[in-house]
């Protein structure tokens, strides 16, 4: 079960969420810092820690796709 109150469009988009969240999990594993995943997911992935994790996990070639997915998940966010 996936719960993230920061992402208003999580329902119906769990597959996208899992793809984006995987970057946060990888980042947390790379740096052995469990709090990193939480920081990465903050504000539905719309934060500097998420971008930092994209670079740290060497996923920059996917940046435009990731931005699109984060936009979908966070649509309607205040």
Curated annotation (Swiss-Prot):
The keyword Hydrolase appears for this protein: no
Entries under InterPro entries matching the protein: Crust_neurhormone_CS, Crust_neurohorm, Crust_neurohorm_sf, Hyperglycemic, Hyperglycemic2
Any one of the GO BP annotations: circadian rhythm
Keyword Magnesium carried by entry: no
SUPFAM superfamilies given in the database record: Crustacean CHH/MIH/GIH neurohormone (SSF81778)
GO cellular component term of the entry, any: extracellular region
Cystine pairs: 7-44, 24-40, 27-53
Keyword annotations: Disulfide bond, Hormone, Neuropeptide, Secreted
GO molecular function terms listed in the Swiss-Prot or TrEMBL record: neuropeptide hormone activity
Function according to Swiss-Prot or TrEMBL: Inhibits Y-organs where molting hormone (ecdysteroid) is secreted. A molting cycle is initiated when MIH secretion diminishes or stops. Also has significant hyperglycemic hormone (CHH) activity.
Family: Belongs to the arthropod CHH/MIH/GIH/VIH hormone family.
Protein name (Swiss-Prot/TrEMBL): Molt-inhibiting hormone
Lineage: Eukaryota, Metazoa, Ecdysozoa, Arthropoda, Crustacea
């Amino acid at each position: 079960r996936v719960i993230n109150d920061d992402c208003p469009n999580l329902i119906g988009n769990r597959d996208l969420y899992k793809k984006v969240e995987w970057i946060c999990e990888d980042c947390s594993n790379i740096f052995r810092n469990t709090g990193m995943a939480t920081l990465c997911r903050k504000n539905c992935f719309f934060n500097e820690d998420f971008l930092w994790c994209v670079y740290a996990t060497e996923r920059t070639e996917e940046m435009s796709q990731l931005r699109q997915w984060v936009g979908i998940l966070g649509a309607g966010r205040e």
